[in-house]
């Protein structure tokens, strides 16, 4: 699909179809009622505007729920530019609704990798009143792509030769080509970006892993808040969100009956736990694969068979990767699977499945069934179905997590952005987690919507436990 591009003195966007804005706005109105935490924060800060005129770049799935986040950031003062963090996850009517309000947004469903990284660059390119191109002061990231691009660009301007090294994947080659182009077209640009950049809040496990790697190498340029490991994110979005959205993606893609099927869930972290529960709830017989003995024991205690992928080949009907690691399902695994097996990923990146190697196989026929559903037929006549090209199945083949659970995640994101800005002179270049009292406050903001009434400690009870009457109620090391 060719995106519709509009550039004016007031706004710019690259989206699929601006005429979808009215539809998007109607769904936004519905979502707002399902996102009590985010809307409460919006109301609380609407007058004080703690992010007034702060330049924020967002790289996060351009869905209806994200549109509510964007409008919250705008309502509390921010100057926002946005791109999606996945080539298939954009809901085009959501992007249109945001573009129609004058917010620069660069996202459409079905981008090429080249288009995706161009959109990421567009989202982080701000123009100062004197015409100088600069970047964001804060970043909302999901998967760490904006963080990666800025760090690699800055390193290139300071002598790095990474862009000249052979690319390990097609996507890495696209990134390197983009950085080379920027070096020619915008000399010194990344230095200007880093000069004003005050922090990033990271949404997902994979992006957090990247942040810790950069920090451990001593190369982290800014303070970072790990939103993913807030309890009200990881134990809700990752677990309960996947519990609902995985089955939604599978059914929209394949109209498959899950009951009675053998389903393999690779990984039993929070995403894996939600995915296994999702499939079990529909009557699937679930097998879990794990490297971690603790997670493996948890899965076993929940009644799941825990085994290796190799032991399931030829008998499993569905495979779901959830690990955040690469090469979980190899091309050899794909060739040995049961005929008509369904393969998908609900971890952040497509390298959990060896998609590039699958596409490079000789004598393999690829048949597109419909958008984000491809059938690969091997020379022996057996076939597999690959969903969303190995990218996030719940967003590529459905609409992602429900609004209510995303309200938890995005309330954390908004609080993290406010915290980064208000403490920009005191935070160090490290990875932080939001404090416990904010985590509890995010949970508290969602209780009334679902009819929950909390018990209140007496002063004697609080003293006995050694906690304040109003909380926080658990130490930081408590595992929920």
Swiss-Prot record:
Keywords: Cytoplasm, Hydrolase, NAD, One-carbon metabolism. Gene3D superfamilies: Adenosylhomocysteinase-like (3.40.50.1480), NAD(P)-binding Rossmann-like Domain (3.40.50.720). InterPro entries: Adenosylhomocyst_ase-like_sf, Adenosylhomocysteinase-like, Ado_hCys_hydrolase_NAD-bd, NAD(P)-bd_dom_sf, S-Ado-L-homoCys_hydrolase_CS. SUPFAM superfamilies: Formate/glycerate dehydrogenase catalytic domain-like (SSF52283), NAD(P)-binding Rossmann-fold domains (SSF51735). The keyword Hydrolase applies. One of its GO terms (cellular component) is cytosol. Pathway: Amino-acid biosynthesis; L-homocysteine biosynthesis; L-homocysteine from S-adenosyl-L-homocysteine: step 1/1. It is found in: Cytoplasm. PROSITE patterns: ADOHCYASE_1 (PS00738), ADOHCYASE_2 (PS00739). Its EC number is 3.13.2.1. HAMAP family: AdoHcyase (MF_00563). Belongs to the adenosylhomocysteinase family. This is Adenosylhomocysteinase. It comes from Xanthomonas euvesicatoria pv. vesicatoria (strain 85-10). The lineage of its organism: Bacteria, Pseudomonadati, Pseudomonadota, Gammaproteobacteria, Lysobacterales. The gene is ahcY.
């Amino acid at each position: 699909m060719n995106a519709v591009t509009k550039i004016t003195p007031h706004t710019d966007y690259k989206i699929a179809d601006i005429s979808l804005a009215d539809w998007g706005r109607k769904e936004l109105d519905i979502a707002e009622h399902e996102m009590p935490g985010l809307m409460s924060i919006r109301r609380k800060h609407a007058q004080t505007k703690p992010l007034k005129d702060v330049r924020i770049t967002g790289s996060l799935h351009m869905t209806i729920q994200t549109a509510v986040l964007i409008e919250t950031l705008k309502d509390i003062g921010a100057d926002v530019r946005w791109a999606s963090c996945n080539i298939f996850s954009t809901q085009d009517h959501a992007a249109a609704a945001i573009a129609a309000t004058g917010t620069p947004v660069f996202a459409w469903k079905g981008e090429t990798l080249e288009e995706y990284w161009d959109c990421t660059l567009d989202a982080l390119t701000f123009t100062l009143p004197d015409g100088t191109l600069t970047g964001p002061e804060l970043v909302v990231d999901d998967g760490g792509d904006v963080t990666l691009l800025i760090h690699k660009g800055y390193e290139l301007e300071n002598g790095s030769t990474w862009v000249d090294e052979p690319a390990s994947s097609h996507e890495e080659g696209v990134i390197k080509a983009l950085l080379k182009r920027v070096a020619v077209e915008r000399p010194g640009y990344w230095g200007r970006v880093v000069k004003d950049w005050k922090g990033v809040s990271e949404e997902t496990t994979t992006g957090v892993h990247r942040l810790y790697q950069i920090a451990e190498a001593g190369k982290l340029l800014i303070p970072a808040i790990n939103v993913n490991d807030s309890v009200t994110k990881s134990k809700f979005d990752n677990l309960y969100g996947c519990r609902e959205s995985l089955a939604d993606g599978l059914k929209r893609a394949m109209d498959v009956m899950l009951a009675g099927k053998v389903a393999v869930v690779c990984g039993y972290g929070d995403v894996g736990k939600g995915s296994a529960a999702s499939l079990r709830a529909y009557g699937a017989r679930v097998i879990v694969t794990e490297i971690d003995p603790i997670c493996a024991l948890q899965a076993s205690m929940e009644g799941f068979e825990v085994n290796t992928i190799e032991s399931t080949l030829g008998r499993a009907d569905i495979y779901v990767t959830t690990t955040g690691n690469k090469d979980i399902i190899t091309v050899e695994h794909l060739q040995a699977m049961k005929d008509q097996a369904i393969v998908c990923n609900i971890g952040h990146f497509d390298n959990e499945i060896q998609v590039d190697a699958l596409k490079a196989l000789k004598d393999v026929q690829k048949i597109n069934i419909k958008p984000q559903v491809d059938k690969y037929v091997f020379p022996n006549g057996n076939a597999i179905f690959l969903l969303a090209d190995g990218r996030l199945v719940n967003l590529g083949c459905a609409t992602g997590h429900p609004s209510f659970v995303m309200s938890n995640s995005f309330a954390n994101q908004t609080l993290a952005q406010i915290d980064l800005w208000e403490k920009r002179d005191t935070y160090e270049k490290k990875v932080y987690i939001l404090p416990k009292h904010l985590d509890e406050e995010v949970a508290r903001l969602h209780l009334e919507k679902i009819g929950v009434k909390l018990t209140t400690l007496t002063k004697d009870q609080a003293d006995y436990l050694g906690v304040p009457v109003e909380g926080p109620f658990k130490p930081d090391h408590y595992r929920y």
